[in-house]
Amino acid sequence: MIKPLGDRIVLSIDQPEEEKVGGILIANNAKEKPVMGSVVAISETSVGDSKAPKSVKVGDKVMFDKYAGSQVTIDGEDYLIVHEKDILGVL
């Protein structure tokens, strides 16, 4: 598993179910990017003098900005590495 640095958090992306309109599948490039995921790993380091505790913990389901982070694939699994500020809320 990847170990995030700084204020970064690793998310497992929740893929939405197949969308159909009138029985027709919508093309992948026409779908909205996912905005929900589960926290997989949290950085143990801090940025600058910020020693504040993280606002999320491993296992939390979160919503994030759809244009946030860097998507990576590790062992066939897709993950998103985001800054803590890109997480909009905990579900």
UniProtKB/Swiss-Prot annotation:
It is found in: Cytoplasm. GO terms for molecular function: ATP binding; metal ion binding; protein folding chaperone; protein-folding chaperone binding; unfolded protein binding. GO terms for cellular component: cytoplasm. SMART domains: Cpn10 (SM00883). The keyword ATP-binding does not apply. Together with the chaperonin GroEL, plays an essential role in assisting protein folding. The GroEL-GroES system forms a nano-cage that allows encapsulation of the non-native substrate proteins and provides a physical environment optimized to promote and accelerate protein folding. GroES binds to the apical surface of the GroEL ring, thereby capping the opening of the GroEL channel. Keywords: Chaperone, Cytoplasm. Its main location: cytoplasm. This is Co-chaperonin GroES. It comes from Oenococcus oeni (strain ATCC BAA-331 / PSU-1). The keyword Chaperone applies. One of its GO terms (biological process) is chaperone cofactor-dependent protein refolding.
